[in-house]
Amino acid sequence: MMNVAWFKNPDHVAYCKEEEILPKLSRELGINDLAQRVETAGFPPRERPELLVLHASSHHTSNTMALWEQTKARLGGDIVCTEIGLRNGTLSDCSGCPYTMCLHFGERGGCFYGGVMQEEVYPAMRRCAGVMMLCPNYNDALSANLTACVNRLTALFRQQRFYDKALFAIVVSGYSGGDIVARQLID
């Protein structure tokens, strides 16, 4: 029995063998176009701009990660990619500290909960010129770990605004809802 899978883009639905999915997705979704957009983004002038890549996926089983690897392979050598994985219990969600407490920790460059956010994500976010979010669609929403990451960025935002950062995303969705996930990132 042949495994058949499908994917949808804004223009049409295509059917293909399972082993052909990623190469076909790569062509259909314009991985080259995404790589070109990252390379030509209006980054502030830097010798080698840094792109922070946030994900909560398994490298071995993730189509989202596979599409990112294809995109990264097409980026020029002028962009430094810093990948941070937010899975396996490394990230606690924001529990809604009182405003003054969040402000207190944020002004000192941290967060009450510490962890990977304070040790890796905050420093990388300060340095980077752009952020790439790798987002599989889970029930028309960002994954829990990516949502927790966005929530926890509030403390850093109190110290440093993100208006000069470019935002990119790879949203992988089985049938529908990818547009909803993308809107969550920009809202």
Language-model-detected regions and their locations in the chain:
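N-terminal beta-loop-helix "entrance" segment that forms/cooperates
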Residues: 87-106
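FMN-binding flavodoxin-like domain, especially the glycine-rich phosphate-binding loop
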Residues: 1-82, 86, 107-110, 114-116, ...
